[in-house]
């Protein structure tokens, strides 16, 4: 007689074992109709899952995040079924859920075309309308291998053979389609109501370029048509804001095949980069960091001591000189420890905050590269705080304040906080993990910040907090992080003399706010669609003459504003003024100063914004004040 405890605390007693769907029906027919899965004692299960003992149960519907996840997983199976219905020779491989959607990889003799995607999506809709039951079954490994060999599914046979277990394997069927899967899945295909296939791309089997090239079909699925429509609108907006397109249009940067994953910064893009760097440098001084600079190429022995050679060797660019192995640094931390190690430190020196705009390189797979968002050469706003265990919470609290200030200045006010705690394999005692996790949690709580715990997601050497900012499209970008490290200082011999005159190893906090300059600039480009706030804009004001008679006055204004540190562009071309205004507006210049005879006579400027707002005629000093006010408020409204 299982007793089922529901999320509101109420209990329901049953005389026999029941399924999740039985319980939903007992609560009400509406809930039974809406159910896509269940959570039994915190574990996500099928609606057909049998409960034969006391348990806590939550019915999962399309309104729940877990419900949407199940719908997406089942959509991948629906996609595979549709493809094999139209193209029987296509072999299925894997079809996982990804952020906002799903994909499935197929082995097929030719690439799928856009017309193919239309047909496949129509078939998916047909199969959804058929409302086919989705059923779970178990097979032994040998039975499964035999079945999929008969079906000609070589990739599934390989997957099954690679599973290190003799236990029965679970399979899901709908109609005549069957797939190996842990589940859970929706109870019937009719639950998959809002989906869209988005694109097709090539993908190597198991991500290895030595293996066969497969066809990967991407799609998105949601709990209802309204959410799907909203998502497709966001995608359309994201495409309009693609930093690669805008970067090219505004002449900010380019990338080319001869230097994959490396950025060619153009004048305006480099100006933007420098504005950000100068801003961050000023903030570092304000928050008592010491800026350092360390070598880019370091001998293998240091990377072996730090552990990077063993764990990241394949991601490092290496070279040789005079029979010695060197690596271009993929990160800055081991070099920062070397700076700390110069001279014997005292507890009075702690906390010591060392910062670097560190140029790093990682040998990312070429298929993973994506504009500024995923590169091989990048600069981190990196810093490492050497402190005692007792100082962790205070230092993390100060860092959070620093991070909030920076994000607000760049126009980001919504931040998501996630605390990753100890994994199974780790270094350090439980006592120091307890202290460190509590210090991070207490630092977040002291600021009144909501945070989510990610159990087991910390690095082997310490827990961390990740900070993700939300952009204007509601997308999350994980940029900031603060990471406790118990391992590296000891591995590299970092020590300080305590107040008891005993040599101790400091704790090291890895921290970054922007993450990398390149990726952060990509985020800014998309967030602002290239229309940067005045303080960031490569050109803050364009001075436009109406005729040649005003050229000298325009040059004079340009000199005055340049001398005050503003970024000015003179446009003295013999073009119609409306043409100039349109061109600089399209180039997203925040302010346009139009100069005609009247402005020369009154020693003023006619100011308008890129939005077309006429700010009227103002003196040079009044315009300077306007620009200064824009600088002062930065991106804050």
From Swiss-Prot:
Enzyme class, spelled out: ligase
Annotated Gene Ontology cellular component terms: cytosol
Keyword Cell cycle applies: no
Subcellular location: Cytoplasm
Entry-linked InterPro entries: aa-tRNA-synt_IIb (IPR002314), aa-tRNA-synth_II (IPR006195), aa-tRNA-synth_II/BPL/LPL (IPR045864), Anticodon-bd (IPR004154), Anticodon-bd_dom_sf (IPR036621), Beta-grasp_dom_sf (IPR012675), TGS (IPR004095), TGS-like (IPR012676)
Binding of Zn(2+), residues: 333, 384, 510
Cofactor annotation: Zn(2+)
Pfam families per record: HGTP_anticodon (PF03129), TGS (PF02824), tRNA-synt_2b (PF00587), tRNA_SAD (PF07973)
Catalytic activity entry: tRNA(Thr) + L-threonine + ATP = L-threonyl-tRNA(Thr) + AMP + diphosphate + H(+)
Record-annotated TGS domain positions: 1-61
Domain of life: Bacteria
Keywords of the record: Aminoacyl-tRNA synthetase, ATP-binding, Cytoplasm, Ligase, Metal-binding, Nucleotide-binding, Protein biosynthesis, RNA-binding, tRNA-binding, Zinc
One of the GO biological process terms: threonyl-tRNA aminoacylation
Its EC number(s): 6.1.1.3
Predominant subcellular localization, coarse grouping: cytoplasm
Reported function: Catalyzes the attachment of threonine to tRNA(Thr) in a two-step reaction: L-threonine is first activated by ATP to form Thr-AMP and then transferred to the acceptor end of tRNA(Thr). Also edits incorrectly charged L-seryl-tRNA(Thr).
Family, per entry: Belongs to the class-II aminoacyl-tRNA synthetase family.
Subunit structure: Homodimer.
This protein's name: Threonine--tRNA ligase
């Amino acid at each position: 007689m299982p007793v089922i405890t529901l999320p509101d605390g109420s209990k329901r007693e049953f005389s026999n074992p029941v399924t999740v769907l039985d319980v939903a029906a007992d609560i009400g027919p509406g809930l039974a109709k809406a159910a896509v899965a269940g959570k039994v004692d915190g574990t996500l299960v099928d609606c057909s899952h049998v409960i034969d003992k006391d348990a806590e149960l939550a019915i999962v519907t399309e309104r729940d995040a877990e419900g949407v996840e199940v719908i997406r997983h089942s959509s991948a199976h629906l996609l595979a079924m549709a493809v094999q219905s139209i193209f029987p020779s296509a072999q299925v491989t894997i079809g996982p859920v990804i952020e906002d959607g799903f994909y499935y990889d197929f082995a097929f003799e030719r690439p799928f075309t856009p017309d193919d995607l239309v047909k496949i999506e129509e078939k998916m809709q047909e199969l959804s309308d058929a409302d086919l039951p989705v059923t779970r079954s178990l097979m032994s490994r040998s039975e499964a291998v035999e079945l999929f060999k008969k079906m000609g599914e070589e990739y599934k046979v390989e997957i099954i053979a690679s599973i290190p277990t003799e236990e029965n394997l679970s399979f899901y069927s709908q109609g005549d389609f069957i797939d190996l899967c842990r589940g859970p899945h929706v109870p019937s295909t009719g639950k998959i109501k809002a989906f869209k296939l988005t694109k097709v791309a090539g993908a190597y089997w198991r991500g290895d370029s030595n293996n066969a090239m497969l066809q990967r079909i991407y799609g998105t699925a949601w709990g209802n048509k309204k959410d799907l429509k909203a998502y497709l609108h966001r995608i359309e907006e994201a495409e309009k804001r693609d930093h690669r397109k805008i970067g090219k249009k505004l002449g900010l940067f380019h990338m080319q095949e001869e230097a994959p994953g490396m950025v060619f910064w153009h004048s305006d893009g480099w100006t933007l980069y420098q504005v950000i760097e100068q801003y961050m440098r000023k903030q570092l001084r304000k928050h008592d960091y010491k800026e350092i600079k360390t070598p880019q190429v370091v001998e293998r022995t240091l990377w072996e001591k730090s552990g990077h050679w063993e764990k990241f060797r394949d991601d490092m660019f290496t070279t040789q000189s005079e029979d010695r192995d060197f690596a271009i640094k993929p990160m800055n931390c081991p070099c920062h420890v070397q700076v700390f190690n110069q001279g014997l430190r005292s507890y009075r020196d702690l906390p010591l905050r060392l910062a670097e705009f560190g140029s790093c390189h990682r040998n990312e797979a070429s298929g993973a590269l994506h504009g500024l968002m995923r590169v091989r050469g990048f600069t981190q706003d990196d810093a490492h705080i050497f402190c005692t265990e007792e100082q962790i919470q205070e230092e993390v609290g100060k860092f959070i304040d620093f991070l909030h200030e920076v994000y607000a200045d760049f126009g980001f006010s919504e931040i998501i906080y996630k605390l990753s705690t100890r994994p199974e394999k780790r270094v350090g005692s439980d006592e120091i993990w307890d202290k460190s996790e509590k210090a991070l949690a207490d630092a977040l709580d002291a600021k009144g910040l909501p945070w989510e715990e990610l159990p087991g997601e910390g690095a082997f050497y310490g827990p961390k907090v990740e900070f993700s900012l939300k952009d204007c499209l509601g997308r999350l970008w994980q940029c900031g992080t603060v990471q406790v490290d118990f391992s590296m200082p000891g591995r590299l011999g970092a020590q300080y003399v305590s107040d008891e005159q005993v040599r101790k190893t400091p704790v090291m906090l890895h921290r970054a706010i922007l993450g990398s300059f390149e990726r952060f600039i990509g985020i800014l480009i998309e967030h602002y669609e290239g229309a940067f706030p005045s303080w960031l804009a490569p050109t803050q004001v364009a001075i436009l003459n109406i005729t040649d008679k005003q050229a000298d006055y325009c040059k004079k204004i340009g000199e005055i504003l340049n001398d005050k540190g503003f970024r000015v562009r003179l446009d003295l071309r013999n073009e119609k003024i409306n043409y100039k205004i349109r061109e600089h507006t399209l180039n997203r210049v925040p302010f346009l100063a139009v100069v005609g005879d009247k402005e020369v006579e009154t020693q003023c400027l006619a100011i308008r914004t890129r939005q077309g707002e006429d700010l009227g005629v103002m003196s040079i000093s009044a315009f300077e004040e306007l620009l200064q006010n824009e600088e002062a408020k930065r991106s804050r409204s």
